[in-house]
Regions:
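N-terminal charged helix/coil linker that caps or initiates catalytic domains
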Residues: 1-37, 70, 323-329, 343-394
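Glycine-rich phosphate-binding loop and adjoining beta1-alpha1-beta2 segment
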Residues: 4-5, 57-100
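Hydrophobic/small residue at the entry helix of a nucleotide-binding pocket
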Residues: 44
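A structured beta-alpha segment of the ubiquitous adenosine-cofactor-binding alpha/beta core
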Residues: 85-138
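Conserved anion/nucleotide-ligand pocket segment
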Residues: 126, 196-237
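ADP-ribose/adenylate-binding Rossmann-like module
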Residues: 126-166
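The feature captures the short pre-catalytic strand/loop hairpin that immediately precedes
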Residues: 171-210
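Cys/His-rich short segments
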Residues: 255-353
């Protein structure tokens, strides 16, 4: 009987990955050369990182802003009692490299919504989510689609959970699945779709290590199939796997793609520039794109930047932060205590009084991608000089 996959002598050599290589379609070198982002290092995130590490994924980027609490210890295989108070991402990265020295893992204490450049997503083979809120999921979805990268979402509640796969150009994306209620909750900055109001207000998240291991296992298994895309393996692209741990029922749902979904915007052409978000000024960037596109070109951002807060009493103060990051105290007048209004921009036309600032000084992250627009045509430019800093030690 013939097979589409052939084994050679190296497939039978005994090493760390020898049993994996016995799978006919398995290519360990792909895993070794893969770069995967894990967003969230809680219950699901721990299982994702553990699985990626055991499989020998070459580079793992771990994003989480939270510190370890004692309640994490019942659901997180990578954490110990002595780790309480430390950042989850840092401990998870350390443990991953202890488990498998072949793996390089790096922690990022960063907000996935505002602090991660699109060029980082662009360098991923896949993004895996272990998140507890819609807003972060939507941000990941939009970032992945802009740079044409797949991502796999996971969520759990008590004994139940689901895993969903979103691949640009293959069925629905995360935003396609969102309801009017989802949008209302995002606007209210509510957490997790699976939580009751009382649980959210009390900060109690009903999760178990058993359900997290099931869902994370499905997520990583789907990632493996995406990494072996040329093997024509069936995936859950545009679909969700739903698991009921109480009855052990499970089923697959297919989501309806919305043709007018705003998240389907993909950057067709991205030009790598020797720019740095830390060192290259907005003035320099604007001058360079005008040299390429024409004198009327403007520099476009994918976010609104709050520039100045203003009070009716005459007091002004500089902000230079994404509007998403604005908090009440930032808009309280230091002089009279009144609520201030603010000005914002999402593009640079050349007449601004802050052109000598760098992107980072106005809230644009390392290795990001910005647009150079003239008329209705946009060309996209990446701050490629930041790659060395972001991927240092990886």
């Amino acid at each position: 009987m013939s097979s589409d996959f052939e084994l050679n002598n190296s497939d039978f050599e005994e090493d760390r990955y020898s049993r994996l290589r016995l799978i006919p379609w398995w290519d360990q070198d792909r895993l070794k050369n893969a770069t995967i982002m894990v967003v969230g290092a809680g219950a699901i995130g721990n299982e994702l990182i553990k699985n990626l590490t055991l499989l020998g994924i070459g580079r793992i980027l771990i994003y989480d802003m939270d510190a370890i609490e004692s309640t994490n210890l019942t659901r997180s295989i990578l954490y110990r009692a002595r780790d309480v108070g430390r950042y989850k991402a840092e401990v998870a990265a350390e443990r991953a490299m202890e488990i498998n020295p072949d793996v390089k893992a790096k922690a990022f204490i960063a907000n996935i919504i505002d602090d991660v450049g699109l060029g980082v997503f662009r360098r991923m083979n896949a993004v895996l989510g272990g998140l507890d809120n819609r807003e972060a999921r939507l941000a990941i979805n939009q970032s992945c689609y802009k740079v044409n990268r797949p991502w796999i979402d996971g969520a759990i509640e008590a004994l139940n959970g689901f895993a969903r796969v979103f691949v640009p150009g293959q069925g629905a994306c995360y935003e396609c699945t969102m309801t009017e209620m989802d949008w209302r909750l995002i606007n209210k900055r509510k957490s997790c779709a699976l939580l009751t109001h009382e649980q959210m207000s009390e900060g109690k998240i009903p999760t178990t290590p058993t359900s997290s291991s099931v869902i994370a296992g499905i997520q990583v298994q789907e990632m493996l199939k995406l990494l072996h895309a040329d093997r024509k393996l069936p995936t859950l692209a545009g679909k969700g796997y739903v698991f009921n741990g109480l009855t052990h029922d499970s089923y697959v749902v297919e989501y309806q793609r919305k043709d007018d979904c705003m998240s389907h915007d993909t950057y067709e052409k991205i030009i790598e520039k020797p720019w740095s978000a830390r060192a290259t000024s907005l003035r320099e960037m604007l001058a360079e794109i005008r040299g390429e596109l024409g004198e009327k070109a403007v520099l476009d951002f994918d976010r609104d930047i709050a520039t100045t807060a203003k009070c009716s009493c005459g007091e002004n103060k500089a902000l230079f932060t994404p509007v998403h990051k604005l908090k009440g105290e930032m808009l309280t007048c230091p002089k009279c205590g009144a609520q201030m209004t603010f000005d914002s921009v999402h593009s640079i036309a050349g007449d601004e009084d802050f052109l000598d600032k760098t992107p980072m000084e106005i809230g644009i992250p390392l290795l990001h991608i910005v647009g150079g627009r003239i008329g209705m045509d946009t060309t996209y430019y990446e701050f490629t000089s930041d790659e060395a800093e972001v991927f240092e030690n990886l």
